[in-house]
Regions:
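Sec-dependent N-terminal signal peptides
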Residues: 4-13
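Noncatalytic modules at the cell exterior or secretory-pathway interfaces
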Residues: 122-134
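Exposed aromatic-hydrophobic patches
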Residues: 114-121
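Beta-sheet-rich sandwich/jelly-roll-like modules and their strand-loop junctions
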Residues: 24-97, 135-200
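Solvent-exposed, conformationally flexible loop/turn segments
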Residues: 112-114, 127
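Solvent-exposed serine/threonine-rich low-complexity stretches and specific carbohydrate-binding patches
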Residues: 100-111
Length: 200
């Protein structure tokens, strides 16, 4: 009888260990994979004013599409686009190399103040060039003159490479087939800008 009991006890202890195993594993917490934007938001062109630059307003000039070419120095996200101008205008974000439209939004009348409109978050890559530009439509423009510290300049984690504009009444989500000027270093017009949140 004893010979039969010993194997039975061994078998039961083996089953008990197997049953206990999932209970042991259940105490481990899963890793969180949800990412959130925790970096500090940056507005590169607006922050250029902290270096002593100033804005000049031009209420009745330019029917151009005007903005700047920029390069993030770290990976991150563009969460808003807009700028400093007067009157409701459309601001757009493109990838420079292929002209892909990344965002287009109507910015409510800033009345010559810095105003940014929400867009669907756009992930941007360090070292890749992008363009932000606003259709001025003949009114409410402004410019910044880079007197001694000409472009390219770095503000936070963004390098503004050059200012650019397309002359004529250009207001389209289609990337311009050419820029009238895209390598100006002493002025930027518009004034278009982005809100950039670096990855952390």
């Amino acid at each position: 009888m004893l010979i039969r009991i010993i194997p039975l006890l061994f078998f039961l202890s083996f089953i008990d260990a197997q049953i206990a195993l999932p209970t042991f594993q259940a105490v481990h917490k899963p890793h969180t994979t949800t990412s959130t934007l925790s970096g500090t938001p940056e507005n590169p062109l607006q922050s250029s004013l902290s270096t002593g630059l100033s804005i000049t307003q031009y209420p009745y000039y330019w029917t151009y599409m005007m903005g700047y070419i920029f390069t993030p120095n770290v990976n991150g996200t563009i969460t808003h686009i807009g700028g400093y101008f007067d009157g409701t205008k459309t601001t757009r974000l493109w990838q420079y190399s292929n002209g892909n439209l990344l965002a287009s939004v109507s910015v409510p009348d800033p009345n010559y103040s810095w105003t940014y409109a929400d867009i669907t978050d756009v992930s941007v890559t360090a070292g890749t060039k992008y363009v932000v530009a606003t259709a001025i439509n003949g009114s409410g423009a402004a410019n910044i003159r880079f007197v001694s510290d000409q472009l390219p300049n770095t503000y936070g984690n963004i390098t503004i490479n050059y200012s650019c504009y397309r002359s004529g009444s250009y207001d389209s989500d289609t990337y311009p087939s050419y820029w009238t000027l895209e390598n100006r270093t002493d002025y930027t017009w518009g004034l278009s800008d982005v809100t950039f949140v670096p990855d952390e």
